[in-house]
Each structure stands twice: as C-alpha cells, then as structure tokens.
Amino acid sequence: MVLLQLDPFLNELTSMFEKSKEKGSVWVTLKRSSLKSKVQKRKLSSVGESIEYRCLIRATDGKKTVSTSVGAKDHQRFQASYATILKAHMTALKKRERKDRKKSTEAEKKESTSTTKSKKL
C-alpha cells in the first residue's frame, strides 16, 4: 500500500475508475486515524495533549491499492475534488425511467375507448 499526497491520490483514483469502466470495480474506504502508534497515543493522553485525527482514505481495484491521509485543513478542498471525480465516473448509477402508474392506466383507458369507438363506426 502506497501513502500518497492528495493530488497524486486523486489522479490514481481517476485512472482506477477509467480502467474499471468496462469491467471491474473500485472500492474506496474512509477511516478516522491518528497515524500514531498506541504507545505514542498513550504518552500524549497522559501528558494531556489532544490527538489530531486525520481521515485515512484507501482505494483499491483488487490489484492495486493506494491511500492518502487528509487533515482538517485540507478536508474541504479534497471533498470537492473527490465529489467531482465520483460524479464523473458513476455513470452506472443513473436513475431509471419509470412509468407513472396513474398516467399509464389513464393512457390505456383512452386507447381502449378510442379503439372501441372506431370499431363501432
């Protein structure tokens, strides 16, 4: 697993989505992390210092795994870029076109009445 900076991570994520466009999947996980060992956490908590938590983001296509760590300062910029990438590559999640039940039953009634009138003439 490779820990990348924000922009290279987003570039790799884009390439993963493009490679899996025809066939395959991309999994993205987000997790709260302090990136410190348990011993360091205990020392900080005993001293009374607060631990700065970051967001650990991992992406994999089954073969290749990349990850990055996002702090509170970079969160808004990363979220905007991440949302843009997801919107661009989630074409399979388009809304289905559904027939409205009321409209379809009314249309069927109109068709049936018009065909019966034409038969009478």
Curated annotation (Swiss-Prot):
Keywords attached to this Swiss-Prot or TrEMBL record, sorted alphabetically, are: Cytoplasm, Ribonucleoprotein, RNA-binding, Signal recognition particle
Biased composition, class Basic and acidic residues, residue ranges? 103-112
- The set of disulfide-linked cysteines is none
Where found? Cytoplasm
List, as start-end ranges, the regions of compositional bias called Basic residues. 93-102
Name the segments for region: Disordered. 93-121
Q: Name one GO biological process term.
A: SRP-dependent cotranslational protein targeting to membrane
Q: Name one GO molecular function term.
A: endoplasmic reticulum signal peptide binding
One Gene Ontology cellular component annotation held by this UniProt entry: cytosol
Query: A Pfam family matched by this chain, by name?
Result: SRP14
Please give the superkingdom of this protein's source.
Eukaryota
Subunit structure as annotated in this protein's UniProt entry: Heterodimer with SRP9; binds RNA as heterodimer. Component of a signal recognition particle (SRP) complex that consists of a 7SL RNA molecule of 300 nucleotides and six protein subunits: SRP72, SRP68, SRP54, SRP19, SRP14 and SRP9.
Function as written in the Swiss-Prot or TrEMBL entry: Component of the signal recognition particle (SRP) complex, a ribonucleoprotein complex that mediates the cotranslational targeting of secretory and membrane proteins to the endoplasmic reticulum (ER). SRP9 together with SRP14 and the Alu portion of the SRP RNA, constitutes the elongation arrest domain of SRP. The complex of SRP9 and SRP14 is required for SRP RNA binding.
Q: Which family does it belong to?
A: Belongs to the SRP14 family.
> Can you name this protein?
Signal recognition particle 14 kDa protein
List the lineage, top down. Eukaryota, Viridiplantae, Streptophyta, Embryophyta, Tracheophyta
| Protein encoded by which gene | SRP14
